[in-house]
Design a protein with these regions (language model features):
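C-terminal substrate-binding subdomain of Rossmann-fold SDR/epimerase-dehydratase oxidoreductases
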Residues: 23, 30-31, 59, 186-195, ...
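N-terminal Rossmann-like NAD(P)+-binding domain of SDR-like oxidoreductases, especially those catalyzing
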Residues: 1-181, 225, 235, 304, ...
Length: 327
């Protein structure tokens, strides 16, 4: 039985990836902060249904000895490094912790693998935010990086570290450059979930206004459940390589609002207000991915529609809010 170790297992991607690997017969391990183990009902809500099937280890990406200890205990065949400070807006507020956690954390994991388990296959969670101020549309594996946030910068550094350990030390170390991917398990701080959650609140009469930043920002949104399948395919490919994973379609925040409110029988114009304070210091105006390489080489497929993704998220939040109101 193969063993997989996931950092960031309590997050959106970690939960879907855990489900996928369990279905494939893996022994799944995850690294979590000790505070999560002490408060699982709140901090591990995405993987609550999996707790009997996975094994969790207390550890911190900011501590090399901590990471070393976990890897020595688990000895994984595959490592999926998903953990990071991933909220772009927050990276402008706290650059130091974003850079420290995301860059040093990645370096620690790679260094531990090189020292203790060089045969383990390593996956790094890259991001479309690495492209930032785009040089071409759509963006593919050859598009130059021009990050516009500390988060984007940290992901470029992680990508370069991963490539360096592959080329310099012979590790099977790969990156998936994933464009925005959402689901009902998305964090409440992200704009897509902020929209769908507030739609549910408005529908139940709990709030009357939703403040958002740049409504014209355009993103390539896909479903996280399909994107974790790509992660596994990248790791299982015969040769270590990097791949862009995306839907290939771009929609604006305004379009997301329109689809979300419309599904609930509402007009977004009646509730959404633009707040200039929510604009980023350096905006990323448009991101569109070209995943042709992944489709051709890995056979990865994405067939969901933008509308179905939005409606799934709204429907889940409407159910969540209905249960909350009843309680």
């Amino acid at each position: 039985m193969k063993k997989a170790l996931i950092t960031g297992i309590t997050g959106q991607d970690g939960s879907y990836l855990s489900e996928l690997l369990l279905e494939k017969g893996y022994e799944v391990h995850g690294i979590v902060r000790r505070v999560a183990l002490e408060d699982p009902s709140h901090r591990m809500w995405r993987i609550r249904h999996l707790l009997k099937d996975i094994r969790l280890h207390a550890g911190s990406l900011e501590s090399y000895p901590s990471i070393h200890k976990v890897f020595m205990e688990v000895r994984p065949d595959e490592c999926y490094h998903l953990a990071s400070q991933s909220f772009v807006s927050y990276s402008f507020e706290d650059e130091f912790s974003t850079l420290n956690t995301n860059i040093n954390g990645t370096h620690y994991v790679l260094a531990v693998l090189k020292e203790t388990n060089p045969g383990c296959r390593f996956y790094f969670a890259g991001s479309s935010e690495m492209f930032g101020k785009v040089h071409e549309v759509p963006q593919n594996e050859g598009t130059p990086f021009h990050p516009r946030s500390s988060y984007g910068i940290s992901k470029v550094a992680g990508f370069d570290l991963t490539r360096n350990y592959r080329e310099g030390y012979g590790l099977f170390a790969v990156s998936g450059i994933l464009f925005n991917h959402e689901s009902p398990r998305r964090g409440f701080e992200f704009v897509t979930r902020k929209i769908t959650y507030n739609v549910a609140q408005i529908k139940h009469g709990l709030t009357k206004e939703l403040k958002l930043g740049n409504l014209e920002a355009k993103r390539d949104w896909g479903h996280a459940a399909d994107y974790v399948k790509a992660m596994h395919q990248i790791v299982c490919h015969k040769e270590p390589d990097d791949f862009v994973i995306s839907s290939g379609e771009t929609h604006s925040v305004r379009e997301f609002c329109e689809a979300a409110f419309s599904f609930a029988g509402l007009r977004y114009e009646d509730y959404v207000a633009v707040d200039k304070a929510l604009f980023r210091p350096a905006e990323v105006d448009v991101l569109t991915g070209d995943s042709a390489k992944a489709r051709k080489i890995l056979g990865w497929k994405y067939s969901r529609t933008f509308t179905s993704l939005v409606e799934e998220m709204v429907e889940a939040d409407l159910r969540f809010m209905t249960d909350r109101v009843k309680a």
